[in-house]
């Protein structure tokens, strides 16, 4: 879907993932942090620091009672285009499919997830928020097993969920473009992406 609006260019690529309770979600949590948790994350290093084609690149998994999405977000750095950042995201996805993360990289992510989780439980309000969050999703008792499940995620699990869910037939792409840039974007769009509908505001 391509949307014309008075705004800077922006892209969202969403892949469909299962509902809470599915065992793949722990590997997807790890994968989300691997891609965009901090300045050492893969998207930041590749797209913002090395290639300098984006001012923002982020990925997150949306977990709920119902099937949801794993979404990549990016905004190009002028004069680079949405097509360039989209291509760069697909390149990072292919890297994930072709090689598992290193032991060091995987352990770093697990340490970050554990630290963030424990930090959220350090106050009464934080603990209440986490219990409420897990109860709304399914069962508050998930709070007792979350870190153990994350610790069990292997590098092969991370590569496996990337191969399983990050496929062309499982994605939806939305692009926000300025009206005057719409023609240029269409001319440079990736050949293997399905035709988009355009909405003008």
Label every model-predicted segment:
Residues 30, 59, 160-162:
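Short beta-alpha junctions and helix-cap segments that line functional grooves
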Residues 8-19, 45-151, 171-177, 184-187:
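M16 family metallopeptidases and their MPP-like homologs
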Residues 39, 81, 154-157:
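Helical mechanochemical/support elements of P-loop NTPase systems and associated helical scaffolds
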Residues 1-2, 145-201:
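Proteolytic maturation boundary segments
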Residues 1-42, 198-201:
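His/Glu-based metal-binding/catalytic segments typifying zinc-dependent metallopeptidases
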């Amino acid at each position: 879907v391509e949307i014309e609006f008075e705004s800077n260019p922006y892209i969202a690529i969403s892949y469909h993932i299962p509902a809470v309770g599915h065992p793949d979600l722990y590997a997807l949590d790890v994968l989300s942090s691997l891609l965009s948790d901090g300045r050492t994350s893969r998207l930041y290093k590749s797209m913002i620091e090395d290639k300098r084609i984006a001012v923002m690149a982020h990925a997150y998994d949306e977990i709920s009672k119902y099937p949801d999405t794993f979404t990549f977000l990016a905004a190009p750095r002028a004069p680079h285009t949405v097509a360039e950042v989209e291509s760069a995201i697909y390149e990072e996805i292919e890297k994930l499919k072709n090689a598992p993360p290193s032991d060091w990289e995987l352990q770093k992510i697990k340490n970050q997830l554990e630290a963030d989780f424990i930090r959220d439980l350090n106050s009464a309000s934080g603990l209440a928020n986490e219990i409420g969050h897990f109860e709304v999703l399914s069962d508050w008792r998930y709070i007792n097993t979350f870190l153990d499940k994350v610790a069990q995620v292997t590098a092969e699990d991370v590569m496996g969920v990337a191969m399983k869910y990050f496929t062309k037939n499982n994605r939806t792409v939305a692009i926000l473009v300025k009206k005057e840039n719409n023609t240029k974007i269409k001319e440079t769009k990736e050949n293997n992406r399905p035709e988009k509908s355009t909405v003008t505001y």
